[in-house]
Design a protein with these regions (language model features):
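A short beta-strand micro-motif
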Residues: 5-11
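Short, compositionally biased
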Residues: 37-53
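Short, surface-exposed secondary-structure edge patches
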Residues: 13-18
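Short, compact, well-ordered microdomains
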Residues: 57-83
Length: 83
């Protein structure tokens, strides 16, 4: 069974107005209602966390990440494995 991953929008200047800061999504077995560009950018991190892995940041490892939308970084999202 896959672990749940919580995604939180921490900043938003989304050109399409899809997101606002504080929006939260729980990822289980289906992708959340994110635009495909943002989902494509974060999916590898989400997949690692869903499968119980940690992300390697060189000197540290963590069960969370922060990422920016590929559209000029207009949206910032934080993801973390739910315990």
């Amino acid at each position: 069974m896959l672990m749940k991953v919580k995604l939180t929008i921490t900043e938003s200047r989304c050109r399409s107005g899809y997101f606002k800061a504080g929006d939260e999504f729980i990822v289980e077995d289906l992708c959340p209602p994110l635009c495909h560009e943002l989902w494509h950018a974060i999916y590898p991190y989400v997949c690692v966390l869903q499968n119980g892995g940690d992300l390697d940041y060189g000197e540290t490892r963590a069960s969370c990440f922060d990422a920016r939308c590929p559209d000029g970084g207009r949206v910032v999202i934080h993801g973390e494995a739910e315990k």
